[in-house]
């Protein structure tokens, strides 16, 4: 049985600054922003998420490294990217994370691309897929039945982050390029539900 995604009603709200420590120019968002450059910002260096979950991107047009931004304060780039192997010191586009419903999240992971090979059903957070019995350090494809998830390259939610949502690609991520991997790898070793 496939659960249908119900978009979060929002409202989403985030305040950003162009300098560290909540200093400099400020702007409030309640909807996606494909480029802060259009607002006269060169970059975003600090932010506060007041409601909803957001996805921040290194480059304009929702490109580059992805960072999940949940409710809280991010006084500098290391607060959102300090746990990654190759942190981006700036964010230039944002969008709300749709379908983030922590209680009802469900995801199927597949060993190979195009939903082939061994599979596993997830409905909880896994700081280490290997500890739950997943062989190897790669996932070939995903089907998001419900909710929104963030996958990380390494155990303990470290390394590159990839956001998976049930309303993007119809919840189907057949290949690493569809979930925004920056390296030609299927390496995913930890997965968690996105907090709303």
From Swiss-Prot:
UniProt organism field: Homo sapiens
Domain Beta/gamma crystallin 'Greek key', first and last residues per copy: 12-51, 52-98, 105-146, 147-195
Protein name: Beta-crystallin A4
Disease tied to this entry: Cataract 23, multiple types: An opacification of the crystalline lens of the eye that frequently results in visual impairment or blindness. Opacities vary in morphology, are often confined to a portion of the lens, and may be static or progressive. In general, the more posteriorly located and dense an opacity, the greater the impact on visual function. CTRCT23 is a zonular cataract. Zonular or lamellar cataracts are opacities, broad or narrow, usually consisting of powdery white dots affecting only certain layers or zones between the cortex and nucleus of an otherwise clear lens.
GO MF terms, alphabetically ordered: identical protein binding; structural constituent of eye lens
Family of this protein: Belongs to the beta/gamma-crystallin family.
Alphabetized UniProt keyword annotations: Acetylation, Cataract, Disease variant, Eye lens protein, Repeat
Ranges where the record places region Connecting peptide: 99-104
UniProt-annotated stretches for the region N-terminal arm: 2-11
Signal peptide residue numbers: none
Purpose of the protein: Crystallins are the dominant structural components of the vertebrate eye lens.
Superkingdom classification of source: Eukaryota
GO biological process, one term: visual perception
Record remark on domains: Has a two-domain beta-structure, folded into four very similar Greek key motifs.
Annotated Pfam families: Crystall (PF00030)
Oligomeric and partner information: Homo/heterodimer, or complexes of higher-order. The structure of beta-crystallin oligomers seems to be stabilized through interactions between the N-terminal arms.
PANTHER family per record: BETA-CRYSTALLIN A4 (PTHR11818:SF19), BETA/GAMMA CRYSTALLIN (PTHR11818)
Modification type N-acetylthreonine: residues: 2
InterPro entries the record matches: Beta/Gamma-Crystallin, Beta/gamma_crystallin, G_crystallin-like
């Amino acid at each position: 049985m496939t659960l249908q995604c119900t978009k979060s009603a929002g409202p989403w709200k985030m305040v950003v600054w162009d300098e560290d420590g909540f200093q400099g120019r400020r702007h409030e968002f309640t909807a996606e922003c494909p480029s802060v450059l259009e607002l006269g910002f060169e970059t975003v260096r600090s932010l506060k998420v007041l409601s909803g979950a957001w996805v921040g991107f290194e480059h304009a047009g929702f490109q580059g490294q992805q960072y999940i931004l949940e409710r809280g304060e991010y006084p500098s780039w290391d607060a959102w990217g300090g746990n990654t192997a190759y942190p981006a010191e700036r964010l230039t586009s944002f969008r709300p994370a749709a379908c983030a419903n922590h209680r009802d999240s469900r995801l199927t992971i597949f060993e190979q691309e195009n939903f082939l090979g061994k599979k596993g059903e997830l409905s909880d957070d896994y700081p280490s897929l290997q500890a739950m019995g997943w062989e190897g350090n790669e996932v070939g494809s995903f089907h998001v039945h419900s909710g929104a998830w963030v996958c990380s390259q390494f155990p303990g939610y470290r390394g590159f982050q990839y956001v998976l949502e049930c309303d993007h690609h119809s919840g189907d991520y057949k290949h690493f390029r569809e979930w925004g991997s920056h390296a030609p790898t299927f390496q995913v070793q930890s997965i968690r539900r996105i907090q709303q």
